[in-house]
From Swiss-Prot:
It holds the Pfam family Seryl_tRNA_N. This is Serine--tRNA ligase. It is found in: Cytoplasm. Its EC number is 6.1.1.11.
């Protein structure tokens, strides 16, 4: 959430930001509500001052007529204060609701654009494999290797669910252990987070659990949701707390299941493991001071690049355009892995790294206390370490040979115990 005073003092910039983010929000209405709130606060303070003066007068020696007048004045002031307080709560609630519809401000380097097709490629790492045969996609490879059962998932749970089996299970566990060890060695504290969060916490992180376009599963009648990412549970971990500046940055690695409706997702690129309703993900999350957030954002992206380089997966980095940013993100990079099983081969998103500045911290009231005892909002950042289902796609499709065998990256062999996957189904 943006600071009210910042909005009031930067109306044109906020309006332009809403425009480039392709968001519908009435900035003028927000400013009007803010001005009303400021006026009401001033009036309320004046009424409270008058009430206190009247109370002091009541303590002095008064004749009956003067005391009766003070009593009437006190009663009238009490009624006016109660009315002003009710009105202030009403205006404050309207202001909060309207302001929460605003996205974060946008970094100057973020390209303008409306969708992921407008994202800007900034680098490539690794060389896509050059096959002498027509590469299979991960769905066909998984069938040959007998490591994923999509049909059983559909029968038991519905479309976009699946069973991992045999070496597929061991490969997922190997990726998890590789990722946890990698991050722990670099100062991250591992977490295994809940799969359910309160609706208020989900909203506080900037996710919308309601509406037809929401990707969040809500639990009927409980005001709780299945988490779509450990960003929710790690971001809410310090809600309402004041941290010590000397304890920052705090680096967390959260392992969780992720549940997503994937409303409206369709097409060949949504096939198989790419868009599913449940998957496992290892998420990086950071709390830091405002002065550290841009450098820490670069570090999260660098760690993602290290992970995918170690996994021998060719990838590119893109700067996400303004129209494709989620509301909390100030700046965001995506890593896209080469997926040769797509017709002709193409890039598919496998990670993101977002700097959300103090947008989420204001909504969840997460602050830190500096050396002078002053309190400030922290900056909060997140980045995908490993979205397991999508990593499996890239591993299978890039590591395949003409016979359907798949070579396992050396970084994973100590964790899974095998160097190749072999076909079981002819």
């Amino acid at each position: 959430m943006l600071d009210y005073r910042f909005i009031r003092e930067n109306v044109d910039a906020v309006k332009e930001n809403v425009k480039v983010r392709n968001v519908h929000a009435d900035v003028d209405a927000i400013v009007h509500l803010y001005d009303q709130r400021v006026k009401l606060l001033a009036e309320l303070q004046e009424l409270q001052r008058a009430r206190n003066e009247n109370a002091q007068t009541m303590k002095s020696s008064l004749d009956a007529l003067a005391r009766s007048a003070c009593v009437e004045t006190g009663r009238a002031l009490k009624d006016r204060i109660a009315h002003s307080e009710r009105l202030l709560v009403q205006i404050s609630d309207q202001l909060l609701s309207a302001t929460q519809a605003l996205p974060n401000m946008t970094h100057m380097c973020t390209p303008h654009g409306r969708s992921d097709s407008d994202n800007l490629e900034i680098k490539r790492c690794g060389v896509p494999p050059c096959f002498s045969f027509s590469p299979r996609d991960h769905v066909e490879l998984a069938r040959l290797l007998d490591i994923v059962d999509f049909e059983a998932g559909k029968k038991v749970s519905g479309i976009k669910f699946y069973y991992l089996k045999r070496e597929g299970v061991l490969l997922e566990q190997a990726l998890i252990m590789f990722g946890l060890q990698f991050l722990q060695e670099r100062g991250f504290v591992p977490f295994l987070t809940p799969d359910i969060a309160r609706e208020g916490m989900v909203c506080g992180l900037g996710f919308n659990p309601r509406g037809s376009g929401s990707n969040i599963y809500r639990i009927e009648g409980e005001h709780r949701c299945l988490v779509a990412t450990a960003e929710i549970t790690l971001g809410a971990y310090h809600a309402g707390e004041v941290l010590e500046e000397r304890s920052l940055p705090r680096l967390y690695a959260g392992l969780s299941h992720c549940f997503r409706k994937e409303a409206g997702a369709a097409g060949q690129f949504s096939r198989g493991l790419y868009r599913v309703h449940q998957f496992t993900k290892l998420e990086m999350f950071a709390y830091c001071t405002p002065s550290d957030s841009e450098c820490l954002h670069e570090r999260l992206r660098s760690l993602e690049e290290e992970i995918f380089t170690a996994l021998e997966i060719p990838f590119r980095v893109v700067e996400v355009c303004a129209g494709d940013l989620g509301a909390p993100a100030y700046r965001k990079w995506d890593l896209e892995a080469w997926m040769p099983g797509r017709q002709g081969g193409s890039w598919g998103e496998v990670t993101s790294a977002s700097n959300c500045t103090d947008y989420q911290a204001r909504r969840l009231n997460v602050r830190y206390k500096d050396a002078e005892g002053k309190k400030h909002y922290v900056h909060m950042l997140n980045g995908t370490a490993l979205a397991i289902s999508r990593v499996l796609i890239a591993l299978l499709e890039n590591g395949q040979d003409a016979e359907g065998r798949v070579r396992i990256p050396q970084a994973l062999v100590p964790f899974c115990g095998f160097e190749y996957l072999y076909p079981r189904v002819l």
